[in-house]
Amino acid sequence: MREEKLLTSLGAAIRKRRMALKVSQEAFADLIGMHRAYYSAIERGERNLTLGTLHRVAKGLGVRMAELMRDCNI
């Protein structure tokens, strides 16, 4: 999978999980201690996440990082 497609797919998986929790981007970004604009770029697939950042996002969503990877067929 190309990196751009991977990041877009991961961002969509993260967005889907956040929306299922009925939490706004701003509220979620605050919850995980991240600036909203940066978090928004993650959901759009415009940021290459470090493992640490992916872990913060997954923890905020209440899932394991592996579950997010499965959501986007990695």
PLM regions and their residue ranges:
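Short alpha-helical elements of helix-turn-helix
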Residues: 12, 36-37, 51-54
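A short, Lys/Arg-rich alpha-helix, primarily the initiator
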Residues: 1-19
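DNA major-groove recognition helix of helix-turn-helix/homeodomain DNA-binding modules
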Residues: 52-67
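Short amphipathic recognition helices of helix-turn-helix/homeodomain-type DNA-binding modules
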Residues: 67-74
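Alpha-helical residues within the helix-turn-helix
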Residues: 19, 30, 59, 70
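Short alpha-helical DNA-recognition segment
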Residues: 22-44
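Flexible coil/turn residues that form the inter-helical turn or adjacent wing/linker of helix-turn-helix
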Residues: 21, 50
